[in-house]
Each structure stands twice: as C-alpha cells, then as structure tokens.
Amino acid sequence: MKVIKMIILAMTGASGVIYGERILKALRGAGVRIGLMITDTAREIIRYELGIEPGALEELADECFDASDFTTSINSGSSPFRAMVIAPCTMKTLSAIANGYAENSLTRAADVCLKERRDLVLVPRETPLRSVHLENMLRVSREGGIILPAMPGFYHKPASIEDMADFIAGKVLDVLGIENDLFRRWTGKDI
C-alpha cells in the first residue's frame, strides 16, 4: 500500500495570515494531502485580518493538529509527512526552530523536518529585521530550511492583495516542486 505523504501547513501569530490562507487553498487545488496547525494567536489574527472563523480554513485540511498537543503523530520522525510550511512565521517561532527549542508541537514538527532532511519552508513576516532575526534565518538555512520571506514581486502587475499573496503562495509551491500558475512568470519579454 502506497502512503500519500502529507504537507503540514502551520500558521503562527504574525500579521499576514492571508499568506497561509492562499497557500492552503493552492495546496488544496493541487490535490495535496494537507495537515493544518493554527496557533491560538493566529486564530485571533485570522478573525481580524480575514474576517472569517479559523474553522473555515480547517475545513480545507485533511487533518488538523493542535500546537499544544505533544502526542500528535507529526512530532515523530516516523510520521510520513514530506514537508512543512510555516506561513506566516513569527520571529519567536523562527528563533525556537533556529535554536533547537521544540517548545510545542509546531516547533517539534519543524525540528523533525530538519533532523529528517525534509523540506521546511518558513515565510517570515516582519519588518524591519534585527540582526538576531537575520542570524536565526541563516541558522535555519544552514540546517537545510528554506527561508522564503513575504516579499512579493511586482513584475506580474498585481491588481489586489490576493495577487500579491498568491505570488508568495506560488513561490512556496515552486520550492516544494508542485506545479502552479498562481502568478504570471517573468519571460523577459515584458519590458
């Protein structure tokens, strides 16, 4: 029997939950098996920024995980998930991952990704950045994690906030090797 490996999407308490929402919808559209984890603070920000209840996003996932539940399957390297995306990623979460501090199920699952050499994609959403933020990003990158900052391009002429968020969602799917058409690709013929 073939196991279809899941991609974990975690949303933490930074502004920019639209990035997590658009990534979730893109993964669903691509037919990917999705495990979703939303922190308590992210739940409040979803209500504020998106004007929806977090349950509306949870309905799109195949499985939901609680960040405070250390007994969840994704806390083990034997769990057959293939990648994890944290979008948006707070600086606190980044720091915990960079320093091997698995304080909850979310940071433990990220730790599993790094130790098992699975894809870990962090979408930090903070500006400006302190030196320690940059150092933590470098640490995660050196461990094999992918830092994909929420810095959308503008060559595709975004007409909405959703277009800008889809640019980042498309880049996340790109690094995971999932084909997508979430934004117009640069051809060099546009100038």
UniProtKB/Swiss-Prot annotation:
It comes from the Archaea. The keyword Transferase applies. GO terms for molecular function: carboxy-lyase activity; flavin prenyltransferase activity. Dimethylallyl phosphate binds at residues 155, 171. FMN binds at residues 13-15, 39, 90-93, 125. It is an enzyme of class 2 (transferase). It catalyses: dimethylallyl phosphate + FMNH2 = prenylated FMNH2 + phosphate. The keyword Methyltransferase does not apply. Belongs to the UbiX/PAD1 family. Flavin prenyltransferase that catalyzes the synthesis of the prenylated FMN cofactor (prenyl-FMN) for 4-hydroxy-3-polyprenylbenzoic acid decarboxylase UbiD. The prenyltransferase is metal-independent and links a dimethylallyl moiety from dimethylallyl monophosphate (DMAP) to the flavin N5 and C6 atoms of FMN. This is Flavin prenyltransferase UbiX. It comes from Methanothermobacter thermautotrophicus (strain ATCC 29096 / DSM 1053 / JCM 10044 / NBRC 100330 / Delta H). The lineage of its organism: Archaea, Methanobacteriati, Methanobacteriota, Methanomada group, Methanobacteria. The gene is ubiX.
